[in-house]
């Protein structure tokens, strides 16, 4: 049986109203076991300042972002189940959900699904990569009982 170990770090000034650990676990379990038997993922929920700093340092973008993915590269000859870290910015997720008219829980789920696929090596830089990644995201989100996160773009 596939197992995803979650290390959840809540690093916001106010952690009230965030999804439960069980929800984060459910969202990870909907993605990762399809691609990898055992894995460990850290999800760190942060405020705008930390997201901004990390986005500037690692992507050269001078603003906070919804989710950052940091895949762990296992050294040759070692076997480890550590997949990597997701850093999700609470304020950006909440703002995007409101602006896009999406249920907040669904947008949180989408950020975990999207970030997890990045940890697994998927990307959306090229159009064909984006189509493949978005199709997988949509399939997983529908299986979780949420709407297609890209429905507005398809209409």
UniProtKB/Swiss-Prot annotation:
Zn(2+) binds at residues 114, 118, 124. Signal peptide: none annotated. Binds 1 zinc ion. PROSITE patterns: UPF0054 (PS01306). Its EC number is 3.1.-.-. Its cofactor is Zn(2+). One of its GO terms (biological process) is rRNA processing. It comes from the Bacteria. It is found in: Cytoplasm. One of its GO terms (cellular component) is cytoplasm. Keywords: Cytoplasm, Endonuclease, Hydrolase, Metal-binding, Nuclease, Ribosome biogenesis, rRNA processing, Zinc. Coiled coil: none annotated. GO terms for molecular function: metalloendopeptidase activity; RNA endonuclease activity; zinc ion binding. InterPro entries: MetalPrtase_cat_dom_sf_prd (IPR023091), YbeY (IPR002036), YbeY_CS (IPR020549). Pfam families: YbeY (PF02130). Belongs to the endoribonuclease YbeY family. PANTHER family: ENDORIBONUCLEASE YBEY, CHLOROPLASTIC. Single strand-specific metallo-endoribonuclease involved in late-stage 70S ribosome quality control and in maturation of the 3' terminus of the 16S rRNA. NCBIfam families: rRNA maturation RNase YbeY (TIGR00043). This is Endoribonuclease YbeY. It comes from Escherichia coli O127:H6 (strain E2348/69 / EPEC). The gene is ybeY.
């Amino acid at each position: 049986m596939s197992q995803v170990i979650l290390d959840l770090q809540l690093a916001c000034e106010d952690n009230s109203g965030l999804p439960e650990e069980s929800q984060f676990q459910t969202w990870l379990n909907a993605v990762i076991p399809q691609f990898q038997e055992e894995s460990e993922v850290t999800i760190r929920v942060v405020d705008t300042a930390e997201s901004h700093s990390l986005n500037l340092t690692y992507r050269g973008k001078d603003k906070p972002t919804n989710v950052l993915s940091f895949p762990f590269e296992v050294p040759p000859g070692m076997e480890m189940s550590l997949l990597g870290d997701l850093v999700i910015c609470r304020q950006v997720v909440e703002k995007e959900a409101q602006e896009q008219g999406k249920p907040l829980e669904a947008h949180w789920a989408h950020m975990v699904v999207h970030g997890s696929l990045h940890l697994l090596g998927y990307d959306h830089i090229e159009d064909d990569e984006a189509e493949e990644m978005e199709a997988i995201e949509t399939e997983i989100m529908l299986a979780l009982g949420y709407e297609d996160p890209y429905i507005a773009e398809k209409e």
